[in-house]
């Protein structure tokens, strides 16, 4: 009888210990630990080209883009910086977007801090003084077709024409890609400005300002980490310039 009791006690203790080990882990607030919807990223570009525009024309240098983003059920928010390695360029971007099936609607805020002064005017939102560029974007991307159409407009902020009035710079881009094995792909994008805008020096009513051909090669590591490496040929017919750009994307 004593042996039976001891055996029963040992089984009960092991059952309790197993049950305790199966209890979900919690954080310091007592909440159950779950997968995070936050992600980090760092991009590197040897030449900062955006929508065909050369963002650094003087003292050009490679630019690093640290970013944090949150995504959940179609909702996406991000904060991203852009910093030239020679300290001659800085950028701070914030954005929100929502995607439903093939449609994405986004709102972006671009800001370019001073790089030669400890003071700035980030919280100055006066129309004629602010350094913020506020943009709305609509993107259509069919679920079964590797292509997209995006239209953006700077509806407020520092986007002023030669007369000092709001320019409402409008840019449209159509693009697509062709996939190969191992996540390699080649993509083509063509972008155009539809009014006198920041993309053409506020001088042309319509202009094709961005043609980009890009090949992406993805390095895969043993821990399932993937490092996309891209080389893009970019030409801007407005300014008759062309560039070859190397891009490296880290995502965590």
Which role does the model predict for each range below?
Residues 42-48, 74-85, 105-113, 120, ...:
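Transmembrane beta-strand segments that form the barrel wall of outer-membrane beta-barrel proteins
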Residues 48-64:
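Surface-exposed strand-loop-strand hairpins of Gram-negative outer-membrane beta-barrel proteins
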Residues 46, 70-72, 98-100, 109, ...:
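Residue-level signature of outer-membrane beta-barrel architecture
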Residues 124-197:
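Detector for outer-membrane/organellar transmembrane beta-barrel domains
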Residues 34-36, 60-64, 71, 88-92, ...:
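Residues that define the transmembrane beta-barrel architecture of outer-membrane proteins
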Residues 22-23, 213, 219, 240-252:
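Outer-membrane beta-barrel "beta-signal"
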Residues 1-37:
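Cleavable N-terminal export/targeting peptides
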Residues 22-37, 141-146, 178-187, 218-229, ...:
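Short loop/turn motifs that connect adjacent beta-strands in outer-membrane beta-barrel proteins
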């Amino acid at each position: 009888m004593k042996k039976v009791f001891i055996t029963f006690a040992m089984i009960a203790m092991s059952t309790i210990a197993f049950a305790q080990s199966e209890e979900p882990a919690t954080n310091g607030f007592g909440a159950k630990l779950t997968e995070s919807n936050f992600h980090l990223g760092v991009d590197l570009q040897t030449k900062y080209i955006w929508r065909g525009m050369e963002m650094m024309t003087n003292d050009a240098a490679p630019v690093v883009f640290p970013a944090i983003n949150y995504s959940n059920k179609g909702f996406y928010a991000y904060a991203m910086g852009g910093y030239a390695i020679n300290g001659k360029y800085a950028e701070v971007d914030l954005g929100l977007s929502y995607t439903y099936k093939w449609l994405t609607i986004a709102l972006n805020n671009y800001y370019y801090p001073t790089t030669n002064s400890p003071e700035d005017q980030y919280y100055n939102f006066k129309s004629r003084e602010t350094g913020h560029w506020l943009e709305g974007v609509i993107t259509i991307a069919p679920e079964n077709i590797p292509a997209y159409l995006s239209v953006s407009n700077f509806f407020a902020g520092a986007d002023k024409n030669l007369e000092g009035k709001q320019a409402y710079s409008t840019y449209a881009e159509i693009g697509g890609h062709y996939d190969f094995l191992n996540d390699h792909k080649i993509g083509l994008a063509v972008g155009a400005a539809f009014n006198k805008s920041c993309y053409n020096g506020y001088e042309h009513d319509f202009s094709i300002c961005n043609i980009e051909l890009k090949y992406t090669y993805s390095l895969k590591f043993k821990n399932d980490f993937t490092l996309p490496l891209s080389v893009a040929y970019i030409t801007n017919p407005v300014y008759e310039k062309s560039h070859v750009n190397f891009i490296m994307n880290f995502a965590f």
